[in-house]
């Protein structure tokens, strides 16, 4: 008989002890003093940015005013600022010229408007038969900014009595159609071309033979064809365009005296190479007082037969003059602003980023576009080594600074 009452073997209970580690395990091959050094570097970087922010707040106001004068429309800002914040050190007079004018375009004609860097002159214009370009028989005449004679006098020999030289920060133009929607027709085309003032020595048939220096314009051939980079749109949509300095430096140009026509009246057009004539008319009202380092904006308005095209033309430019010590303007001059690398860098960035032209309706948002370009550029520039990167790092984090200057 099997005994089933034998005691069963009891299994030993297994006890599992779990240890919870509350302290973080140091990473392998990373000493603690390395982490401390890294954290200290971050704190120092933030401290340096804070100090540069304070310095930038003091020094960048003329730079921001310079950007606003160069790119903001006059209905937003008419302050000429303190001048161009580059390495020039001297007394200057800043001026923002503005012209508002109603204009009508002749039917069956193509009207050419040149926004050229000529101080005191808002634009030059001429009309040619529809579908053609200016020829040797074409003469461009000026339309002045208000105050031309107060700045440059009423004679061709008094142009430099107040100021001796000048340089441009920007030129702007807008055409805002006012035509009846049932009567307008035609188109607007815009492009730019580099035009420079040149001095050429011509022989004079005298006994004994001699020569004379004559001022002529080179680059006007760019007006005779639509450039590859251009803007074309229906007339009723209008246009807005800007031109900025694309030279390495903002160089001053001399104020010229005794020039009413280019080429001069006693020099044949063919001998100078100019395709057409620039005539400023009576010296009591206008004149050619110089030519700056800016690309000329060319606007062609085509109006077919039967069209009734009218518009408001608005032009403005930001210029810096050097006043003469014995002139009344000298008392209104001021020292050129200190160097602002950030403002100059952003000026170049905006100039490269803007299109040749936009429709007139987008002029209202052009300053917003400029602000977005500046902000995005500063965010990218904060990673650049050197003073530009350091200053950009501070300014990109200081939104109140932008707001204080209209940004």
Curated annotation (Swiss-Prot):
Top EC class of this enzyme: hydrolase
Q: What is annotated as the active site? A: 75
Q: Where is this site: Cleavage?
A: 363-364
- Residue positions binding Ca(2+) 5: 249, 251
Disulfide bond sites: 69-318
Residues involved in Ca(2+) 1 binding: 161
Q: Where is the composition biased (Basic residues)?
A: 1-12, 33-47
**Record key words, sorted:** Aspartyl protease, Calcium, Capsid protein, Disulfide bond, Hydrolase, Metal-binding, Protease, T=3 icosahedral capsid protein, Viral penetration into host cytoplasm, Viral penetration via permeabilization of host membrane, Virion, Virus entry into host cell
Binding annotation for Ca(2+) 2: 161, 221, 273
The UniProt annotation places Ca(2+) 4 binding at: 221, 273
Q: Where is the composition biased (Low complexity)?
A: 13-32
Give the site residues for Interaction with viral RNA genome: 402, 405, 407
Positions binding Ca(2+) 3 in this chain are: 161, 221
Record EC number: 3.4.23.44
**Region (Disordered) spans which residues?**
1-47
Annotated GO biological process: proteolysis; symbiont entry into host cell via permeabilization of host membrane
**Record's GO cellular component, any one?**
T=3 icosahedral viral capsid
User: Which Pfam families does the UniProt entry name for this protein?
Assistant: Peptidase_A6 (PF01829)
Family recorded in the similarity comment: Belongs to the peptidase A6 family.
User: What protein am I looking at?
Assistant: Capsid protein alpha
Annotated source species: Flock house virus (FHV)
């Amino acid at each position: 008989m099997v005994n089933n009452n034998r005691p069963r073997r009891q299994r030993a209970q297994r006890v599992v002890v779990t240890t919870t580690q509350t302290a973080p395990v140091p990473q392998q091959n990373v000493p603690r003093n390395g982490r401390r050094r890294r954290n200290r570097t971050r704190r120092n970087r933030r401290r340096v940015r804070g100090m540069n922010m304070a310095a930038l707040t003091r020094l960048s106001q003329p730079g921001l005013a310079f950007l606003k004068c160069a790119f903001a429309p006059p209905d937003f800002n008419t302050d000429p600022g303190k001048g161009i914040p580059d390495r020039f050190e001297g007394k200057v007079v800043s001026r923002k010229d503005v012209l508002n004018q109603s204009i009508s375009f002749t039917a069956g004609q193509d009207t050419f408007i040149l926004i050229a860097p000529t101080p005191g002159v808002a634009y030059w214009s001429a009309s040619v038969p529809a579908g053609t370009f200016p020829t040797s028989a074409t003469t461009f005449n000026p339309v002045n900014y208000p105050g031309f004679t107060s700045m440059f006098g009423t004679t061709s020999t008094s142009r430099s009595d107040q100021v001796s030289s000048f340089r441009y920060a920007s030129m702007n133009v807008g055409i805002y159609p006012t035509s009846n929607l049932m009567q307008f027709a035609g188109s607007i085309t815009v492009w730019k071309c580099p035009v420079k003032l040149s001095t050429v020595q011509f022989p004079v048939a005298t006994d004994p033979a001699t020569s004379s220096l004559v001022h002529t314009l080179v680059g006007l051939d760019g007006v005779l064809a639509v450039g590859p980079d251009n803007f074309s749109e229906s007339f009723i949509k209008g246009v807005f365009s800007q031109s900025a300095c694309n030279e390495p430096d903002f160089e001053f140009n001399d104020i010229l005296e005794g020039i009413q026509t280019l080429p001069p009246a006693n020099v044949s057009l063919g001998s100078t190479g100019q395709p057409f004539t620039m005539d400023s008319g009576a010296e009591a009202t206008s004149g050619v007082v110089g030519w700056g380092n800016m690309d000329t904006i060319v606007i062609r308005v085509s109006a077919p037969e039967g069209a009734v095209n009218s518009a408001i033309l608005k032009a403005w430019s930001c210029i810096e003059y050097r006043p003469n010590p014995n002139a009344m303007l000298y008392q209104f001059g001021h020292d050129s602003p200190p160097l602002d690398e950030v403002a100059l860098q952003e000026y170049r960035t905006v100039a490269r980023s803007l299109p040749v032209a936009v429709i007139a309706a987008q002029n209202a948002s052009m300053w917003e576009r400029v602000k977005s370009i500046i902000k995005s550029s500063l965010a990218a520039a904060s990673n650049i080594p050197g003073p530009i990167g350091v200053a950009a790092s501070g300014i990109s984090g200081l939104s109140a600074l932008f707001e204080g200057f209209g940004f």
